[in-house]
Structure formats: structure tokens, C-alpha cells
Amino acid sequence: MTDTESLVVSSDPKHPANLIVELCKLFYDNNWVTGTGGGISIREGDTVWLAPSGVQKERMQPTDMFVMDLKSRDYLRRSPTFKPSACTPLFLSAYTLRDAGACIHTHSQAAVMCTLLYDKVFKISNIEQIKAIPQVVESGYLSFFDTLEIPIIENTAHEEDLTDTLQAAIKEYPTCTAVLVRRHGIYVWGETVWKAKVYNEAIDYLLELAVKMIQMGIDPEGGIGSEKQGKFFRGLQG
């Protein structure tokens, strides 16, 4: 085995290349990364593993991975089959600006729908699942009564062209752990790959819930009891 192959071939199920394969299959089953869309990257120190472009996520193999040095931005290992992901500069933005250990990009339908329903920022409050989201600037997690805010940036024709606006959103919203891209999807990051996974799952739950609340005429940011003003509740009262 060559030195470069040893970067992606391992019997350890916790090896980044193996984890990316496992998680991409899981995200495919959740309908988040269909049609070769989306991606994931994991960082350990200055070494970054990246899912490639154009791969069917449920069929990905560890040997399909790219490996990069974070400081030099040089590839330590290239996929023999696929091209580098256009998401790469956005993943690197989460590493350099937030010291993240992993970054996930999905084309979640709930994420896309929320970008059509909200203007500049997605907001939701008074929902239990919010407690899974970190405060980022301060230690700990958001509380039930806190408001989760996720900035929304405009899509571009080419993924890499999102880099500047994504970086600007990260800087403008220092407490965010995700950025939505209008009519496109979402980027979510975390201190470790498992935390990024949890944040992504919790956020997607909240995005889907917000869409359903709006359909029922309920304000996702409304206070407790505001649901009684929704059209569905009023219809039940006859």
C-alpha cells in the first residue's frame, strides 16, 4: 500500500474515510444527498478528508476520497476516479473561521423550502429540539425559550462562488452553526463529525417543523400559546 492510499484505507470504522462513506449512505437514505448532490468533509488537525464531486453518495468508497493539507491547501491524495468537490472552499471556510472538525452539506427539501419562506434569516423558538443546538460563542446549548437563527445567502451558478457570502454570513452571525443557501440547501458544521451530524439532524427537524407550522398558520417564532391563533386551530373551534 502506498503512503497516499494509507490516508483512505483503514480497517478502523472510525477512520475519516470510512465515516464519510457511512454518513453519506445514511444521508442518502434520509433523502438529503440524492442525485450526487451534497457532501461531507472531516478534519483531523491539519488533515482534511473530502467526499468527491459527482459520486452517488450511497455507492461511495473510501478510495474515492480526496485528502488535503489545511494549511497549504495542497492535495495529499487525489481520487483516481472523481473530481474535487466544488464544496471544498466552503468546507474549508468552516474550518478556518470556526475551527470546525467536520462540515456537512445537504440538499434537504426542508432547507430549500425554508429559504423560500424566509428572507434573510430563518428563526424558530419555543421548540424542544432547539436544545440540541450549541450557543457557539458561550459554552452550552440553546434553551427551550431561545430563538435559533440561521442566516440565508443567495445561490450562485457555481458552488465555489458561494464562498465569500458564506464567510460573510459566518462572521455576521457568530452564534450560527449553519448557513442556508436559497433554493439550494444548507451547510452545517460542528466541533466533531458526530456533533455536526447531531446539529444537522436537529436543524433539519426544525426546518421541516417550521414548514408544517407555517402551513397551519402558526408562527414558528411565536410565543407559547400562539398556535391557538393558527388557521388549523381556529378551524377546529368551528
Curated annotation (Swiss-Prot):
The active site is at residue 128. Substrate binds at residue 87. Zn(2+) binds at residues 105, 107, 184. InterPro entries: Aldolase_II/adducin_N, Aldolase_II/adducin_N_sf, MethylthioRu-1-P_deHdtase_MtnB, Salvage_MtnB_euk. Keywords: Amino-acid biosynthesis, Cytoplasm, Lyase, Metal-binding, Methionine biosynthesis, Zinc. One of its GO terms (cellular component) is cytoplasm. Gene3D superfamilies: Class II aldolase/adducin N-terminal domain. HAMAP family: Salvage_MtnB_euk. Catalyzes the dehydration of methylthioribulose-1-phosphate (MTRu-1-P) into 2,3-diketo-5-methylthiopentyl-1-phosphate (DK-MTP-1-P). This is Methylthioribulose-1-phosphate dehydratase. It comes from Yarrowia lipolytica (strain CLIB 122 / E 150). The lineage of its organism: Eukaryota, Fungi, Dikarya, Ascomycota, Saccharomycotina. The gene is MDE1.
